[in-house]
From Swiss-Prot:
UniProt family annotation: Belongs to the 'phage' integrase family.
UniProt-listed Pfam families: Phage_integrase
Name of the protein in its database record: Integrase
Residues forming coiled coils: none
Domain Core-binding (CB) residues, every copy: 57-161
InterPro entries: CB, DNA_brk_join_enz, Integrase-like_cat_sf, Integrase_catalytic, Integrase_recombinase_N, Tyrosine_recombinase_XerCD
Gene Ontology biological process terms, A to Z: DNA integration; DNA recombination; establishment of integrated proviral latency; symbiont entry into host cell; viral genome integration into host DNA
Gene coding for it: int
Protein's UniProt keywords contain Zinc: no
GO molecular function: DNA binding; hydrolase activity; transferase activity
Membrane-spanning parts: none
Length: 387
């Protein structure tokens, strides 16, 4: 029998019906269990070769293969998070047994993970201080969250069918398309009010975001070696950008002023905390430390004090883009400044500056044969007649 051991783990090694050699760890230290797995694998290989059956694959096996083949993905951590959710429902299940009904049933149970994490921190803090922790109430996940999880399992099962030949037919999964929400942006006076309500270092981060349009992760992870103050430029490396392309950032005077205030705070990171804080477990954090891009407590407090609602940090990027478009910056230039991969992603700002369409809109005037008088002039004339 082609069964051997390396260290304490048993391995299977045998020749497949097509003449190829099969060798695989059986993942067990027990010889009897290893023998059973060996015989099962050998029998399955014979059925696949002689009877044309599709080999069985567990959901865990598919996930492991996916992670191995997609190891280069920048968003691999996102895939791992989605795998974690689906494993709660399909662990130990054969791919062929995963149906559309089971998938849709599982996705309805997904909840807002950030909401749960925040509650756990609150619960831990309350218990430590001898207080009664709040009752946890699950918060439904957003449509966009459900869509990304469905897109992942759809891609995984398609790969199992089309690439790995481990599935006869993948389930047909319809992914909901989140509605395009309006672009949320601030008027200059609102932005100034928000900045005034922010405390350092958040204040500098917000100012820098409004002056450069950079994403929060790019700002928080910005290093001094990525900045040339003399040339007034900064750059985001390809592996740091969403589009996987390097982004050159032209630094205006506002951005340079913000950067100069950060000089001397840290040898590596541009934006850092300079005061110690108490962690949920009661320990103290270092006085000078890198900022967290997912810390929202100070941000939410500043929004509340400024009286600004329905506004995310990423909307600062929308605000920056909206201001530039309204100032006459061409869409193509904005695309390059913001590092967007396609022009389609920038067109959502085009409606904010329709001035280039005015000449075309005037073609209707020729149909009526008359020009419309200036509205302000008409109002003045009416006021004179009434007098």
């Amino acid at each position: 029998m082609s069964l051997f051991r390396r260290g304490e783990t048993w391995y299977a090694s045998f020749t497949l019906p097509n003449g190829k050699r099969f060798k695989q760890s059986l993942g067990t230290k027990d010889k009897r269990q290893a023998t059973e797995l060996h015989d099962k694998l050998k029998a399955e290989a014979w059925r696949v070769s002689k009877l044309g059956e599709t080999p069985d694959m567990t959901f865990e096996g598919a996930c492991v293969r996916w992670l191995e083949e997609k190891a280069h993905k920048k968003s691999l951590d996102d895939d791992k998070s989605r795998i974690g959710f689906w494993l709660q429902h399909f662990a130990g299940m054969q791919l062929k047994d995963i149906t559309e009904t089971k998938i849709y049933s599982a996705i309805q149970k997904i909840t807002n993970r950030r909401h749960e994490e925040n509650w756990k921190l609150m619960d831990e803090a309350c218990r430590k201080n001898g207080k009664q922790p709040p009752v946890f109430k699950p918060k439904p996940a957003a449509v966009a969250t459900k869509a990304t999880h469905l897109s992942f399992i759809k891609a995984l099962l398609r790969a199992a069918e089309r690439e790995w030949k481990m599935l006869d037919k993948a389930p047909i999964i319809k992914v909901p398309q989140p509605k395009n929400k309006r672009i949320r942006w601030l008027e200059p006076h609102e932005a100034k009010r928000l900045i005034d309500e922010c405390q350092e270092p958040l204040k500098s981060v917000v100012e820098f975001a409004l002056s450069t349009g950079l994403r929060r992760s790019n700002i928080i992870n910005l290093e001094w070696q990525q900045i040339d103050m003399q040339r007034k430029v900064a750059w985001i490396h390809p592996e740091q950008s969403k589009s996987n392309h390097a982004i050159g950032v032209a630094l205006n005077d506002t951005a340079c002023r913000v950067l100069k205030k950060q000089i001397g705070n840290h040898h590596k990171w541009v934006f850092v905390y300079k005061e110690s804080s108490t962690k949920p477990d009661g320990t103290k954090s270092p006085v000078v430390r890198k900022m967290r891009y997912d810390a929202n407590t100070a941000w939410r407090a500043a929004l509340k004090r400024a009286g600004i609602e329905d506004f995310r940090f990423h909307d600062l990027r929308h605000t920056w883009a909206s201001w530039l478009v309204q100032a006459g910056v061409p869409i193509s230039v904005l695309q390059e400044m913001g590092g967007w991969e396609s022009i389609e992603m920038v067109r959502r700002y085009a409606h904010l500056a329709p001035n280039h369409l005015t000449e075309h809109a005037r073609q209707i005037d020729s149909i009526f044969g008359t020009s419309v008088p200036n509205m302000s002039h008409s109002k003045n004339k009416e006021g004179t007649n009434n007098t």
